[in-house]
Amino acid sequence: QAVLISEYRRIVASDVLNRVIKPVILFKTVKNTENIDNLYKDFIKLIENLSVNEINEIFEKSTLEAILKLKEKVEDINSFISAIKYGFRKDSCLVIHSKIKDKEEKLKYLNSLENPKNPIRAIFAVDILNEGWDVLNLFDIVKLDEAKKTANSTISEAQLIGRGARYFPFEY
């Protein structure tokens, strides 16, 4: 559903505000790097194999207002699926964690997400990007696991929510 809501934001910005935006989703876990690598692979497979039946099932079962409004906006479901497959293709997704080989190169992408030429729409991260990182077009944060609650994790979660729970940062 996060991908569909992200697409809804993109479509509304285009239709209502006449602006091209690139909403970014952060998929975050505190578990091991192998777990995030597998989640990334599963996500890519899900996007590549996305079908009309799957989208229709989400549209029919969802009670989220954004999904219901998106359903009304989608005129051609095949074009909509093509847009998702293009927007979230393999080279538009980034995996980052402490053990990644090309971490410095990936950090350059992360620090230029607002650049229209930067293709990244989804980030898969393991216990990284916790402090001092702010991106105007990061609208959705998907927590992929439940960790034990500590005072530090509660503060970290509040900071994370603060990054994702923002108003549309552009004038309209």
What feature does the model see in each segment?
Residues 148-171:
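Conserved SF2 helicase motif VI
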Residues 31-33, 129-131, 146-150, 165-166:
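Conserved nucleotide-binding/hydrolysis micro-motifs of P-loop NTPases
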Residues 39-47, 139-145, 156-161:
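Short secondary-structure boundary/capping segments
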Residues 123-139, 160-164:
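SF2 helicase motor core recognition
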